[in-house]
Amino acid sequence: RQMCIRDSTKSVDAANRLVHLLLFFQEAWAQATAQPPLHIHFYSSDLRTSERKQLLRAFERGEVDVLVCSDLIARGIDLPDVRHVISYDVPVDMAKYVHRVGRTARAGRVGDAWSLVEEQEVYHFKRMLSEAGQLEHIQRHKVHSGAFDPLLPHYKAALARLAQLYSQQR
C-alpha cells in the first residue's frame, strides 16, 4: 500500500487531477499488460467524515492500493502498514519531511519514503537534510533519459483522457 502526499499549499483541484491522471494511466497500463488495476483514491477534507473513515478502513484492509492526500490531511492519519510514502512535492522544511517519512514504518515495520525532487530543488533538499544530520540516510535514484520510454504511450493516453475530462467540465 502506498500513500502519495501533495503539498498542502497546492489546490485540491491539483490533487484531483493527479488522482485522475494516475487512474487513467493505470487503466491504460493494465489493458496493455493484463495487470490487475490499482485502486487509487483521493483522501480529502472535502469528503464527509464517514467517507474518510470508510476509505481508511478500505486502505487498511488492502482494498485501496494508493491513497492521495495533502500534507495537512495526512497529519491526522495513523495507518499501521504503509509501505511507501511518495512526496509528490518536495517538503519545504525538515519538520514536514519527518512527518511525511513518519507515515511509513509504523510499529517497527519496514517502509520507504520517496521524494520526487526536480534538478533545481536538489541543492535545497540536500542542504535541509544535511543540516538535520539526515543526509546519510538518503539514497539518490537518478532517472536516466529513456527509462520511461515504454510507459510514454500510456502516459500520453492518460493525458489525453485528462484533457478531455477537464474540457467537458468547463
Residue map of PLM features:
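Conserved small/polar residues in nucleotide/adenosyl-binding loops
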Residues: 1-8
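Conserved two-lobed SF2 helicase motor
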Residues: 56-74
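Arginine-glycine-biased low-complexity disordered regions
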Residues: 2, 13-39, 54-57, 61, ...
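Residue-level preference for the first positions of well-ordered beta-strands
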Residues: 6, 65-66, 112
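Conserved helicase motor
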Residues: 9-13, 40-53, 70-74
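SF2 helicase motor core recognition
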Residues: 68-85, 100-109
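Conserved beta-strand segments of the P-loop GTPase G domain that flank and frequently precede/overlap
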Residues: 8-10, 43-44, 86-89, 115-117
